[in-house]
A protein has these predicted regions:
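Basic, nucleic-acid-interacting segments
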Residues: 1-135
Length: 135
């Protein structure tokens, strides 16, 4: 019988610490009154255009470098269309096809043994709203 090796993949989300949202000038603060930290762009009002937050790009690039990823020559963003209750626009701005970092690797020590952790990609994307459930 052929030896099999388990490969476990994890998707991790990190909230960017910044003054404003990734593509919107609206304040980036979670624990405030609902529907107060919004801008016309967050609701896809006609004529509104996103502007990427430079602070967020710098932080994502720093993470990409720290994890030994390859960085692209240009930043490209995609519009991912889907319906979800906390997605007021009906689409999400993301880097689904052209991430800010790809093919990374870090080594970790486990029981005196060095093991590689491979990073598929790091990408910026918006989460323009959230649902809070209090029971």
């Amino acid at each position: 019988m052929k030896k099999q090796i388990a490969v476990i993949g994890l998707e991790m989300h990190c909230e960017m610490k910044s003054n404003s949202k990734v593509f919107s000038p609206a304040k980036n603060a979670y624990s405030e009154i609902p529907n107060t930290n919004i801008a016309p762009l967050d609701m896809a009002f006609p004529g509104t255009l996103p502007v990427v937050n430079k602070e967020c790009v710098k932080k994502a690039l720093m993470m990409s470098i720290a994890l030994n990823c390859k960085q692209p020559r240009y930043l490209v963003f995609d519009r991912k269309n889907y319906y979800y209750p906390d997605l007021p626009k009906g689409y999400q701005i993301t880097q689904m096809n052209n991430p800010i970092g790809v093919d990374g690797k870090i080594d970790i020590e486990v029981n005196d043994k060095i093991l590689p952790v491979y990073i598929h990609d790091i990408h910026l994307e918006e989460d323009s709203a959230s649902l809070d459930h209090f029971f």
